[in-house]
Amino acid sequence: MVKIKTTHVGSLPRSNELSSLLASKDNQEKIDISSFDAMVKKNVSEVVKKQINSGLDSVSDGEMSKISYATYIKDRVDGFSGESERKAPKDLDDFPSFKKKLILSGGTPTYKRPCCTSELKIKDEVSVKKDILNFKNALEENSHTDGFMNSPSPGVICNFLPNKFYKNDDEYLEKLSDIMKFEYEKITESGLYLSLIHI
């Protein structure tokens, strides 16, 4: 019988405590970094165990350390500031009462979405290494080796953190590709699979 390996994609639920810390961090409020790191480590360990126990073959760290799957880049790369215009999905335009209800219920993301306003430069080389270490430790705790780590494609970053500095989006995408190479290489060099998010 042929075994078909199973996996999934996307962020996984964080604990209320971690969600609160991520929101505070995103709002540039002062947080205790050692407490944050410990909470991320705990959440990664728990989410890896849950995935394995559910029968998945290839598991992820659930993106526990990140406020969102794309905008966390603003915390690791210099060159972003301000706030970008938020556009509701086009399909909601056909249902204005539902769209209004969704907005009033808090069903729209409130995390920061700045624009690229200056030259992009890596400012944080440590966070991706922490993510990898937490994930590899959680895999080892569970005697599991098949793991993948998500990272946004340059196109996704361009969509969520729009260009207001480079002469056009092609130049912006090229610069993002150069910048993201660091994170992509760290993930693959660690022996983990790299899952590029492109939507």
Could you say what each language-model-derived stretch is?
Residues 1-197:
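Domain-level signal for soluble alpha/beta catalytic cores
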